[in-house]
Swiss-Prot record:
Composition bias, Basic and acidic residues: 305-314
Subunit structure: Homodimer. Component of the tRNA-splicing ligase complex. Interacts with FAM98A.
Protein name in UniProt: Protein FAM98B
Tissue: Expressed strongly in colorectal cancer tissues compared to wild-type colon samples (at protein level). Expressed strongly in colorectal cancer tissues compared to wild-type colon samples.
Stretch list, region Disordered: 303-433
Transmembrane parts of this sequence: none
Keyword Cytoplasm assigned: yes
Biased composition (Gly residues): 331-433
InterPro entries: FAM98
A cellular component annotation (GO) from this entry: tRNA-splicing ligase complex
Membership in a protein family: Belongs to the FAM98 family.
GO biological process, one term: positive regulation of cell population proliferation
Length: 433
């Protein structure tokens, strides 16, 4: 099975003709036979030379080139070839056969002449495309931000609205209007700029980053203040008198509230437009400033409010965690006699109680009361232990601890002490076994 037969291969003449038609060429070389014949004749063909001159002039009008191809060199072929060679070198022609070798032998072949036409026509096509893109970028949409800014300048300066959206042309009108206005005012009317240096691209980018960081910080602060404003105004409507006027408050407050924006409006343009008078510091409490900042709310006086205290010099110190230390006093409790009472207690505590009938109980120690009496059938109750108080025949009392009641023992009927509890000792008794 045979596939489709391949079509005719594209030729260089066909590429040149297609490019010339796209460029809008209206000369005599739009036919393939005429183009081939002119390429074979080279620079000696007037049609070929005219086409080269037309392509070179179109390229020069779109590009900033020093070299050019003019009609003045057609009479002298060597000069004409020098112009073409210099033009191709400035255009960075990739065909070495057109820019190197003996200049008299460069355009003698048909293929070399077609390469020259193809290079010039394609370069012209590329230049037209780039120029068209630049023109489209300058013809901005009338709804774009840049166009709105330029139109705002037109309104401020009193320039009639432009029918075109060509930004460079509109900026030229603004510049001429500003120069005309400045020529009619005093020399120092505008003042010297605060920023006296010219910024390069790197410095401008750095200032943009600084402005972005500050804008984020101020946006956070503005949002906080706006939220506080909302909460404050909302709290005014809590009273019964204000609840009936909710609609009136909203009608007055909402338009002013929506006019506040959390986004900052300071840009690089404000920095460039700042003048030296902006750096002057003026006190906000000066007389001239207060004339413009005074309002009726400054005359509203607050009533008397209760004193909430909280001053450091009025705060009382906390109470001590332990009692103050005092020196021990001399003197302690004595021992009781036969049937006698107990001795007096030491400093800070109660005295020990006397035992009944037997050899008496001992006195208490530091703050502690000793107890316990011996004798026939007499059982003394234990005393309360004070601060490290010690009974006579008993155990040691703890810190504020309480001595236990002694148990009855079995022993000597003449006052033998039984096993006591924590505080006072137990009394022995005359008991029957």
């Amino acid at each position: 099975m045979r596939g489709p037969e391949p079509g005719p291969q594209p030729t260089m003449e066909g590429d040149v003709l297609d490019t010339l038609e796209a460029l809008g060429y209206k000369g005599p070389l739009l036919e393939e036979q005429a183009l081939t014949k002119a390429a074979e004749g080279g620079l000696s063909s007037p049609e070929f030379s005219e086409l080269c001159i037309w392509l070179g002039s179109q390229i020069k009008s779109l590009c900033n080139l020093e070299e050019s191809i003019t009609s003045a060199g057609r009479d002298d072929l060597e000069s004409f070839q020098l112009e073409i060679s210099g033009f191709l070198k400035e255009m960075a022609c990739p065909y070495s056969v057109l820019i190197s070798g003996d200049i008299k032998d460069r355009l003698k072949k048909k293929e070399d002449c077609l390469k020259l036409l193809l290079f010039l026509s394609t370069e012209l096509q590329a230049s037209q495309i780039l120029q068209n893109k630049k023109h489209k970028n300058s013809q901005l949409d009338k709804n774009s931000e840049v166009y709105q800014e330029v139109q705002a300048m037109f309104d401020t300066l009193g320039i009639p609205k432009s029918t075109t959206s060509d930004i460079p042309h509109m900026l030229n009108q603004v510049e001429s209007k500003v120069k005309d206005i400045l020529s009619k005012v005093q020399k120092n009317h505008v003042g010297k700029p605060l920023l006296k240096m010219d910024l390069n691209s790197e410095q401008a980018e750095q200032l943009e980053r600084i402005n972005d960081a500050l804008s984020c910080e101020y946006e956070c602060r503005r949002r906080m203040l706006m939220k506080r404003l909302d909460v404050t105004v909302q709290s005014f409507g809590w009273s019964d008198r204000a609840k009936v006027k909710t609609d009136d408050i909203a009608r007055i407050y909402q338009p002013k509230r929506y006019a506040l924006s959390p986004k900052t409006t300071i840009t690089m343009a404000h920095l460039l437009a700042a003048r030296e008078d902006l750096s002057k510091i003026i006190r906000t409490s000066s007389g001239t400033s207060r004339e413009k900042t005074a309002c009726a709310i400054n005359k509203v006086l607050m009533g008397r409010v209760p004193d909430r205290g909280g001053r450091p010099n009025e705060i009382e110190p906390p109470p001590p965690e332990m009692p103050p230390w005092q020196k021990r006093q001399e003197g302690g409790g004595g021992r009781g006699g036969w049937g006698g009472g107990g001795g007096g207690g030491g400093r800070g505590g109660g005295g020990g109680g006397g035992g009944r009938g037997g050899w008496g109980g001992g006195g208490g120690g530091w703050g502690g009361g000793g107890g316990g009496g011996g004798g026939w059938g007499g059982g003394g109750g234990g005393g309360r232990g004070g601060f490290q108080g010690r009974g006579d025949y008993g155990g040691r009392g703890g810190y504020g601890g309480r001595g236990g009641y002694g148990g009855r023992g079995y022993g000597d009927p003449y006052g033998g002490g039984g096993g006591g509890g924590g505080g006072g000792g137990g009394g022995g008794g005359y008991r029957r076994y």
